Amino acid sequence: MHANLQERIFCIPCDVTKEADVKNAIDKTVEKFGTIHVALACAGVAWVTPTLTSRGPLNTKVFESVMAINVLGSAYMAKYAAVVMSKNKAVNEQGEKGVILFVSSVAAQEAQRGQTAYGASKGAINGIVMPMARDLGRYNIRVAAIAPGIFATPMGAKMPKKVQDRLNADTPMGRPGLPSEFAHMVGFCIENGYINGVSLRIDGATRLSHL
């Protein structure tokens, strides 16, 4: 790890499906840095969960696991981050105390074969954003989600190459998004004090409805 980042990066093992683990991660972060101003819930999985195949019906155990990681894990993070942020001093003239960001997906709005659980989990993330933004507005904490399309990430790399090639070909820009482009979107959501209660797409005009 680069020497210049050693005091700015802090790693804590955490199973996001366990509320106590998430609380511990938040507590340790506050212990290390004093407080939290930005929290990004980005742990997630996209395990295949077809509704019905020749091998049988929907695997509800896998469905439950996807929901636990993608939805409950995000909710736990937001719960404990909000407690910390509510005690912060305002960081600007608008009185802002913190920003909570979720990672949604274009799959929340568009059908993908075999992704019943993933689509449901990201739809749940979109559904969390507005009520949470309204609940936390009184504490001057903003809440938003970012909904990426196809990105060059380890998760995307697990797809068969022919699927990756087809997805890239169907994107008007002819390529997946870059991690740096997602990072820029995160920075934009943090810096723009009027982004609140929304899920913003960053997808290069990709549409998944025919897949």
Predicted regions mapped to residue ranges:
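Alpha-helical segment proximal to the catalytic Tyr-Lys
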Residues: 83, 134-135
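Active-site helix of classical SDR
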Residues: 78, 121
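Active-site loop-to-helix junction immediately N-terminal to the catalytic Tyr of the SDR YXXXK motif
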Residues: 110-119, 131
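C-terminal substrate-recognition "lid" of short-chain dehydrogenase/reductases
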Residues: 175-202, 207
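Conserved mid-core segment of classical short-chain dehydrogenase/reductases
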Residues: 46-64, 83, 87-93, 114-117, ...
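Catalytic Tyr-X3-Lys loop
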Residues: 45, 56-76, 101, 125
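Short, small/polar-rich loop/turn modules that mediate ligand/substrate recognition or access, typified
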Residues: 137-142, 195-198
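Residue(s) in the substrate-gating loop at a strand-loop-helix junction
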Residues: 105
